[in-house]
A protein has these predicted regions:
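Well-ordered, non-membrane alpha-helical segments in soluble/globular domains
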Residues: 21-28, 54-56, 84-96, 118-122
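Short, well-structured hydrophobic secondary-structure segments
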Residues: 62-76
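Short acidic, S/G/P-rich loop/turn micro-motifs used as interaction or catalytic elements
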Residues: 12-17, 48-50, 75-79, 113-117, ...
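A short, glycine/acidic-enriched catalytic loop
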Residues: 74-104
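Leucine-rich repeat
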Residues: 59, 95-100, 125-126
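A domain-level signal for caspase-like cysteine endopeptidase catalytic cores
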Residues: 1-66, 103-110
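Active-site-proximal C-terminal subdomain of hydrolase catalytic domains
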Residues: 114-191
Length: 191
């Protein structure tokens, strides 16, 4: 069975006025499904409880071939923002919620600045979750450019078996874009 993608995205309705384009990542998942028959699951969450519900559900055996977790949220240093919560969710809290779900999987944060800051926090997240690779951005990102990079990255993650050559190909093809977005991976930390 093919590797699949689980996309979890926050609700944007509270900031719709600021998000004039009212963009979400569901069309990216539809594109992957139509392009190469990639199994994709798309879910929207606004609260910790909703996120926790889906993370628990994805522990079921039927989801074991979904090797990529794609999180689309607002973000800040080592955090993601759930639209229905006052406080951001730290990566460590997310790791606790996941309860082993990310082990051996690829985890990508398509959110502003989530991987900004101390490498120790990212190392701790990788060690706790045992994720195969964690990636994301260190800068405030433009939706258009991050969507281009995200779809290219997910395609590489779906088709590649080795991380180093995958990341080298990505840099060769999209190095300028990666610099613009502040793309960062746990592979750089040799975790």
């Amino acid at each position: 069975m093919k590797k699949g993608v689980i996309c979890i995205e926050t609700e944007w309705q509270i900031t719709t006025q600021q998000n004039k384009r009212s963009i979400n990542t569901e069309p990216l998942m539809n594109f992957l499904q139509k392009l190469d028959d990639v199994p994709c699951i798309y879910r929207r969450v606004a609260t910790r409880d909703e996120l926790k519900y889906y993370l628990k559900k994805f522990h079921n055996k039927e989801f074991e071939n979904y090797k990529i977790f794609y999180f689309s949220f607002h973000g800040d240093t080592h955090e993601i923002a759930l639209e229905g919560e006052k406080e951001n969710l730290s990566l460590m809290e997310l790791g606790d919620m996941a309860d082993g779900l990310f082990e051996g999987k690829f985890v990508h944060f398509s959110s502003c600045r989530t991987l900004l800051g101390s490498d120790e926090n990212l190392k701790d997240f990788v060690e706790e979750t045992r994720a195969k690779l964690v990636s994301g951005y260190t800068r405030s990102v433009d939706t258009f450019y991050s969507a281009i990079h995200d779809i290219a990255l997910i395609n590489e993650l779906l088709t590649s078996t080795q991380i180093k050559p995958l990341l080298e190909r990505m840099y060769k093809l999209y190095g300028g874009l990666e610099k613009k977005l502040g793309f960062k991976t746990s592979d750089e930390l040799h975790v």
